[in-house]
A protein has these predicted regions:
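Small-residue-enriched hydrophobic alpha-helices in membranes
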Residues: 2-5, 66, 100, 133-155, ...
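Alpha-helical membrane association modules
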Residues: 2-226, 251, 267, 272
């Protein structure tokens, strides 16, 4: 279990490095590109409006979903390194989307790299600026009543912020078991993640740009600060998860996938092969494997989804896996939809979020 966790952490670190170095310069590059575009199209009827904000978001979400769904996945965590270029493209499109939404809300004069990064960071939580990521978000963006303050920071601080964002994205991508081990179905899972995350970024952009924006130059006062973006934000080890939940997350996820396969009355041979691949690579103990074998004859396995809900990235990864598996044959059964909606609700997702995910890709 420890070896697999080390491998996963190493892959996250490498993905973070590959994505981070490209994303550091992407904020300024994309902002300049979009600024040039709107300078060439200066007339009001050529510019996005508040009324078009949702269609802007939907357009980028569809585009990003298609990019990731076409990715050529290789089995195993190390194979996920091959999709770094697609992840970078998705993130750049998300930055462009934030800029376009900002223009729609007539906030173009405030759209510097710090504000763009702050919107992206805030979309990784559940509130406007979620307390759990305040330590990072507050470097570049602060919610103060009805006002949003974007803080101009020094180059080293911004670079650390961009690397943290890259690490968070790498961590989210690797939460999908289907993406890692079932390339044929995994491409669908990647497409779902890209479309969903883009929609989340877009919705957060609208929420933020509805407010008053102010720019604060903090390059001097924050010059000596640094962000601890590596150790504190890597996923907890299997042992830590076991101590917290009493049952490892991977086992809970597999039980949930089995329930999905059983929802139409029986587990098909193809589904058994999928299950075998995931179990083999989950690095389960012999006792856990035996528990799974025993549960195959049970009509429905009991799973405490509140335990998974404590880990939002894992919960999202599981929800995406469920939808990708259900859609694999092109026939998304009503019983599968009902089960996924129920699981999503128990893990804390809104009906709207689950519905949007099921409609993606």
């Amino acid at each position: 279990m420890i070896n697999q966790q080390n491998t996963s952490n190493n892959v996250i670190q490498e993905l973070q490095n590959q994505i981070g170095e490209k994303i550091i310069t992407s904020f300024d590059m994309v902002a300049q590109d979009r600024s040039n575009y709107f300078a060439k199209n200066p007339y009001q009827h050529q510019r996005p409006s508040i009324e078009s904000a949702n269609s802007i978001v939907n357009g980028y979400a569809k585009c990003n979903g298609g990019i990731s769904a076409a990715a050529n996945l290789v089995p195993g965590p190390l194979g996920m390194l091959a999709v770094a270029p697609e992840i970078i493209t998705v993130m750049r499109n998300q930055i462009a989307m934030i800029y376009d939404v900002g223009v729609a809300y007539d906030k173009q004069q405030y759209l510097n790299k710090e504000l763009l990064a702050g919107v992206l960071i805030s979309s990784l939580g559940t509130g406007l600026i979620t307390p759990g990521i305040n330590a990072i978000a507050n470097r570049v963006i602060i919610a103060q009543g009805s006002k949003i303050i974007a803080r101009k920071v020094s180059t080293p601080i911004f670079q650390d912020t961009a690397r943290w964002i890259a690490g968070k994205y790498a961590q989210q991508v690797l939460k999908s078991s289907v993406s890692k081990w079932l390339p044929g179905v995994g491409a669908t899972a990647m497409g779902l993640w890209s479309a969903y995350s883009t929609k989340q970024v877009g919705n957060k952009s609208i929420q933020i740009f509805e407010k008053e924006i102010e720019i604060l130059d903090d390059t001097q006062s924050l010059n000596e600060c640094s962000i601890e973006y590596t150790d504190n934000f890597l996923p907890p080890s299997d042992i830590e998860v076991n101590n917290i939940t009493g049952e490892r997350l991977e086992l809970l996820k597999i039980k949930t996938l089995i329930n999905l396969m059983k929802v139409d009355g029986s587990i098909e041979p193809e589904e058994k092969e999928y299950l075998k691949t995931i179990i083999t690579n989950a690095n389960l103990t012999s006792a856990e494997i035996q528990e799974i074998k025993n549960s195959l004859s049970v009509q429905r396995i009991e799973v405490d989804y509140s335990l998974i809900a404590k880990y939002p990235d894992d919960a999202l990864g599981l929800l995406i896996d469920l939808i990708a598996l259900a859609k694999r044959d092109g026939d998304f059964h009503i019983t599968e939809k009902m089960y996924i909606k129920q699981v999503g609700k128990l893990m804390g997702f809104s009906e709207v979020d689950v519905a949007e995910l099921m409609l993606s890709c």
